[in-house]
Amino acid sequence: MLLKRLIKLAIFLFFVAVGFIIFIGSFWLNTYNTKEWANLLAEKDASGLIVQIIPNINQWFKGTVEQQQKLFQTLVHFFIPVGFGLLFGIAVAIIADLFYHLIKYLIKRSFKKN
């Protein structure tokens, strides 16, 4: 029972990580070269797909960072994209779990009819 829960947790964390990588790579930075991510996250602007979806995201991002105390600006600057990435990853994991349970239900239902 514990092993089954650990496996489910590992699968959930895998999907969260995949969603996080997709968000940071595609939506925020527009690159999957992870060696560049630290330097690109240190810049003030998002450059990925999120700029097309929400055109004023960079203005909001700069305004939010500038409102913080000087000591916390760098911290907030990294937490915003990382936080959005984690939320996106959790959403991907939940959607994958829903699809898994839906397919499992449909397969069980199709065998019960026969």
UniProtKB/Swiss-Prot annotation:
UniProt superkingdom: Bacteria
Record's subcellular location: Cell membrane
Gene Ontology cellular component list: plasma membrane
Topology with respect to the bilayer: Multi-pass membrane protein
Keyword Transmembrane: yes
Keywords tagged on the record: Cell membrane, Membrane, Transmembrane, Transmembrane helix
Chain segments annotated as transmembrane: 9-29, 75-95
Record-given protein name: Uncharacterized protein MG267 homolog
